[in-house]
From Swiss-Prot:
Residue numbers spanned by region Alpha N-terminal domain (alpha-NTD): 1-236
Top-rank lineage group of the source organism: Bacteria
EC class (word): transferase
Organism, scientific name: Novosphingobium aromaticivorans (strain ATCC 700278 / DSM 12444 / CCUG 56034 / CIP 105152 / NBRC 16084 / F199)
Subunit structure comment from the entry: Homodimer. The RNAP catalytic core consists of 2 alpha, 1 beta, 1 beta' and 1 omega subunit. When a sigma factor is associated with the core the holoenzyme is formed, which can initiate transcription.
Any one GO BP annotation for this protein: DNA-templated transcription
Gene Ontology MF terms in the entry: DNA binding; DNA-directed RNA polymerase activity; protein dimerization activity
Catalytic activity, EC: 2.7.7.6
Chemical reaction(s) catalysed: RNA(n) + a ribonucleoside 5'-triphosphate = RNA(n+1) + diphosphate
Lineage: Bacteria, Pseudomonadati, Pseudomonadota, Alphaproteobacteria, Sphingomonadales
Protein name as catalogued: DNA-directed RNA polymerase subunit alpha
UniProt region (Alpha C-terminal domain (alpha-CTD)), positions on chain: 258-353
Pfam families reported in the protein's UniProt record: RNA_pol_A_bac (PF01000), RNA_pol_A_CTD (PF03118), RNA_pol_L (PF01193)
Amino acid sequence: MTVNIKNWQELKKPNNLEIKPGNDSKRRATFVAEPLERGFGLTLGNALRRVLLSSLQGAAVTSIKIENVLHEFSSLAGVREDVTDIVLNVKQIALKMQGEGPKRLQLSATGPGEVKAGDIAVTGDIEVMNKDLVICHLDEGATFNMELTVDTGKGYVPAVSNRPVDAPIGLIPVDSLYSPVRQVSYKVENARIGQELDYDKLNLTVETDGTVTPEDAVAYAARILQDQLALFVHFDDQVPVGHVPMVAGVPAHAPEESDANQLNRYLLKKVDELELSVRSANCLKNDNIIYIGDLVQKTEAEMLRTPNFGRKSLNEIKEVLSSMGLRLGMDIPGWPPENIEEMAKKLEQELLG
């Protein structure tokens, strides 16, 4: 099968991801990605938003059991809130949980005073993030004892689904919002490349409950999308296949006909044979990049960190590599081969002969 790698390699990809922290950097941040091809801001923004809100793992309370309470429509002496109000407050508890559930936690308090989420007796693998959340108020002499069952999951699970078949009397199931992401919004603006404004800039704002940072949340969402889409890619683009490359205008022999084996013959070509500007050639030389095989394994970010190497030189090299069916950031297993100089000389002799 012939793979037209230009389908994805010639699309503009964001070369910069700017992260703008909010007032609380652990809970809120805005991500700015540009430039994107026209329409990709909406495509990526909507996909990331849906995954962020629906698919990330988290922890939540699934049920509670309060001493001397038979059902959620009860009230307790000395407790100002009804049980229904307590349930609503319990649903807002933000938990960070390691390992698998379900697990049980205890909350005991004596009045007068406020009962807060921070009063919950937690184990070493569970942390309450919003310790100042008020669960209820107790009057003088009142006591309050509650058992909470917590578990891990994703999305939203209604209380009716959290009731076990053999639920004891007094067990009150709770709606569980497992998602650690509280709010996601995005805005698409125009981005400029030179004099062209026909590109997108994606502004993605993420707010979490503190159990996961916005940076990690976005990374998880992107990884989920990557994992789901992998099924649809039925070819390997690491080394171009389906065609015999041209080296210096001469068709290269099939890989199995020489010691190069499966290596693309271009990889054995020296970078000083490329028609590059003096600046670009000197930058590659100073960075000890000798063969094209050395060059293609460099990422764009690594190249831009090279002294005196700028965006113009990067675009020049990307264009030259693209004409050969190669790109930056490739993974070439077994590179460099131990006998690379011998292989390069043999290839040169084959071309001259």
